[in-house]
Amino acid sequence: MATDYTVGDLVAEFLSACGVTTVFGIASVHNIPMLDAIGRRNSIRFMMARGELGGAHMADGYARVSQGLGVIFSSTGPGAANAIGGLFEARFAGSPVLHITGQTSTRYADRAMGSVHDPYDQLGMMGSVCKGAYRVRSAQNALGVLTQAAVEALSAPMGPVSVEVPIDLQRVKIERPAVLDNFVLPLAAPRVPTDAELDELAARVVAARRPLLWLGNGAKQAGGAAAKLLDMG
């Protein structure tokens, strides 16, 4: 069946299905098909940054405020490298950021043939600061890779994850996945403490002379409960 739906369209629709309404970054020759698809859908606002570093910080800030997925688009090679400082901060802060970067055509990637902005081990570079770094290696596995990356970013401990989408694959026409009709990220439900664990914790707090409440990134969604505990004195 003929279709005009591309991997770039898949990226745009996937982000919408994840609840993303704003993305940040820099337009380049290696990510234009994805950004064009976002423009055609007209459901996600693209905020152009002055540079990839700023775009990564913007995505980090968006994730912190929205308590959802922050997204930055960059070019390949130097463009992806420029985002590293912001992604490192997102990793340190536990912010769920999805970094989507272009990559040179699959026939040239990793072959050191001098293709435009063909970086040496870009996956290794991004993996050094992110929770994970992945490449879309075929049009058929694009949705799976994006889903894995988003779930990893949003799973405790949250943090940035990078995905490469080679420029030739961005333009490949595919059948629209029917699963996107009612798509929900397969996030694991937070662990609920048992009554016995809660009783033990309560006993320790009551017995403590000067209790200290030290909350980490895993308690980001528990602000109300933490405030209630503090108010109990």
Region spans (language model):
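N-terminal alpha/beta PP-like core and its mobile active-site loop of ThDP/TPP-dependent enzymes
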Residues: 1-233
